[in-house]
Design a protein with these regions (language model features):
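Glycine-anchored, exposed beta-strand/edge motif detector
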Residues: 2-8, 13-156
């Protein structure tokens, strides 16, 4: 098993509201990233699911995905930045930079700690886990993030 971590991204220069980017880039970024409310304990690299719909401010609330808890799956993306304790930016798809150690072409899954792993989660006897592929390694440090929204249930 090879564990890899998501690198923190400073998205202030890449947000859709930034006037330095053109309309095409703005539209692309709207599909790749979204701002969300998250728990203070959530960290960069945690895969998350939508836990409640849009607030009046147009912000989703996300919570950590746990393969042992079916109601928290599937994950829709990964936290790539936190602008405050409870405000985060989630990347939903596209190229993602990690800490390295990945094998190009290998599939990557959500681990039991909501982080990235190169093997599916293993259920204990009489346990169920939801196995979700979230991307494919493009290189040692790059993952093509594209969460499978139809994960598989594994039985122990």
């Amino acid at each position: 098993m090879v564990r890899t971590r998501i690198r923190h991204r400073d998205l202030r220069l890449q947000l859709p509201e930034n006037p330095a980017i053109d309309n095409d880039e703005r539209d692309l970024l709207r599909g790749r990233y979204f701002e969300a409310t998250c728990a203070g304990t959530d960290v960069v690299g945690d895969f998350v699911h939508i836990s409640s719909g849009l607030s009046g401010a147009g912000i989703y609330t996300v919570a950590k995905s746990d393969p042992r808890t079916k109601s928290t799956m599937p994950a829709v993306g990964v936290i790539v930045s936190k602008s405050s304790t409870v405000r985060c930016f989630v990347q939903a798809l596209g190229e993602l930079t990690t800490s390295g150690g990945m094998t190009p072409g290998d599939r990557y899954w959500i681990a039991l700690d909501s982080q990235l792993d190169n093997v599916p989660p293993t259920p204990l006897p009489a346990e169920l886990v939801v196995a979700q592929v979230v991307g494919v390694a493009l290189s040692d440090e790059k993952l093509l993030l594209r969460p499978d929204l139809a994960p598989v249930i594994l039985r122990g």
